Amino acid sequence: MNPSRNLFLIGPTGAGKTSVGRRLAAHYGLAFVDLDHEIERRTGTDVATVFAVEGEVGFRRRESTLLAELSAGDGVLLVTGAGAVLAADNRALLATRGYVLWLQAGIEQQLERLAHDHQRPLLAGTDRRTRLEAMATIREPLYSETADLALPATHGIATTCSQAIALIDRHWQRHSLPTPSPAA
């Protein structure tokens, strides 16, 4: 059990991490950060362009640096990109700096949710099913290794959020954030 002040969401692309994460952050009073969106904000361009210019290695380097920075504090709900778990250092940071919920999604569900999304660089120009299956084979053991809890995200966002809250409340030994001292 990881007593923590942070909550991290991991899982495959199309699992609903960002949508669920926003609601969970509001529920628990945590600052919401989406790692991919933060990379876009800081670079001034989208993830696909970062991949095109810097390659996956450059993107993963940025991702790791930003994860280390943003997970260092307290009171954050951070949504990782689907591939953040590929780096052992990232997995270690997640495991030691927060409570980790793995939102699980099957291939059919991912294909349905990503049908109109053409901004995913690792899914561009390939047979999406084959690519998603290959990524799942590599990443699912890493998600399992890193996660404190796993939740199949097989329903809509509202239902998944309700299920996540019930699951988290049963298992997360959350440390309270420090209360400010009264002014003297």
Summary of predicted features, one role per range:
Residues N2-P3, R23, H27, G73, ...:
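NTP-dependent small-molecule kinase module
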Residues L9:
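Hydrophobic anchor at the beta1->P-loop junction of P-loop NTPases
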Residues K17:
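Conserved lysine of the Walker
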Residues D34-A95, Q119-R120, E133, L142:
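ATP-dependent small-molecule kinase phosphotransfer cores
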Residues T96-P141:
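A glycine- and Lys/Arg-enriched "phosphate-lid" helix/loop adjacent to the NTP-binding pocket
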